[in-house]
UniProtKB/Swiss-Prot annotation:
It comes from Archaeoglobus fulgidus (strain ATCC 49558 / DSM 4304 / JCM 9628 / NBRC 100126 / VC-16). It catalyses: 2 L-glutamate + NADP(+) = L-glutamine + 2-oxoglutarate + NADPH + H(+). InterPro entries: 4Fe4S_Fe-S-bd, 4Fe4S_Fe_S_CS, Aldolase_TIM, GltB, GltB_archl_type, Glu_synthdom. GO terms for biological process: glutamate biosynthetic process. Its cofactor is FMN. [4Fe-4S] cluster 2 binds at residues 34, 55, 58, 61. This is Archaeal glutamate synthase [NADPH].
Amino acid sequence: MMLEGEFHTHMLPEFMIERRQDRCIRCRVCERQCGFNVHWYDEEMDMMREDEMKCVGCQRCAVMCPTNALVVKPHPGNYKPNANWTRERLQDLKKQAETGGVLLTGSGNDKPYRIYWDHIVLNASQVTNPSIDPLREPMELRTFLGRKQDRLEFKYSEDFEDIEITTELYPNVQIETPIVFSAMSYGAISYQAFKSLAMAASEFGTLFNTGEGGLPKELRKYGKNAIVQCASGRFGVDPEYLNVAAVVEIKIGQGAKPGIGGHLPGEKVTLPISVTRMIPEGTDALSPAPQHDIYSIEDLSMLIYALKEATNYEKPVSVKIAAVHNVAAIASGMVRAGADIIAIDGLRGGTGAAPKMIRDNVGIPVELALAAVDQRLRDEGIRNKASILVAGGFRCSADVVKAIALGADAVYIGTPALVAMGCTLCQKCHTGICNWGICTQDPYLAKRLNPEITAKRLVNLLRAWSHEIKEMLGGMGINAIESLRGNREQLRGVGLEDWELEVLGIKGAGE
């Protein structure tokens, strides 16, 4: 049980605030900008003061200070050094002793697991094959997501001038870049942030994922760029919701919290969110850990084809899972069950809220999962029957290029999009207080995010990454993204063990 009444915490502050009094003009901007009530004005002393115990390090006050009077940095106070009992472990124990609760956190896994992208390098053309200048020659990043035919058959006219495809084509979705916005639900993020993603995806010609919280009626005009989720809570799912979208995704798992469900507290379920999710206002939105109609591959197949039936077989159906130990076998079953797209969310996938112990200890890196899945599907001769979307830890365009060379068709990005909006990874998404207006339902905080401006920032990010991808493709002498897909000869490992190179399916540098 949580300690009540007056008691003195045993925890140390996480951050310290340095205030240049010679620069501070007592404008109280820092006080107004901080939703955690860190700053306050001392009338008697005519100076600003701060409660460092409340500071989460979001940097909003420092960024908005008109005189640059504030510096927020990690607190130097520490316990006696101990290799086994780090500061973080001690702080976590003390917090649980005071609250009696599960430790919650936001964002993705921040532990020092090996980041395989940083141990993989790309190839470049030298002498024997020419490189391509993307500024002067066309480069193709257009990607099609969905099941592909084994072969195409054509019917020719007698004079061979007219050609007709006789093969029945599966529904595919066209995107102009192999980058898609990850699932972030309305409720977990603000309406303004949600709308920004929709607007940016629509403008650039890619997709955004609604998450499991439904799609507001007024934003369904962006449906042709939406991946809508059918998750365990079935929030917001109705025929219109399914048919307005480009892709329907069955959410089985999430990289940040494999094997558990979700919980949106009632205080976040405002009237607009309750209408979108189709639940009473102010009630907790609980997503069960499993989908209670899926306990086998056969059950999954039934839901896949039920959704295909509901959408008149006009939408690709995706199935999203967390990257776990037997991910390759699971993915094979998903494809055979009828999934047109398989989405794999890795160990570093972000979240609005997750138990810290699960986020930091459950699942495997997406690099290894992707390589294993792509190889398994190729070995079984079914790779063309589904596209592979991967998520969880993509930080830059080079990560995207390496993922495609490992076998991905496209990647989800979540945290980079949030950072483009203003996020500083303070990891307090679960509190409902976000000084940048992203992960909050507080109208005062949410209005800080202007969808028109934020959408432009997101479009700029997509444009910059896409141009960098073209530069890297050109350097390899490749002019179309599809020629890179699964082309592991363009990759080499640096500083990796033999077993890691084997799983990744790449050679060591110099080979």
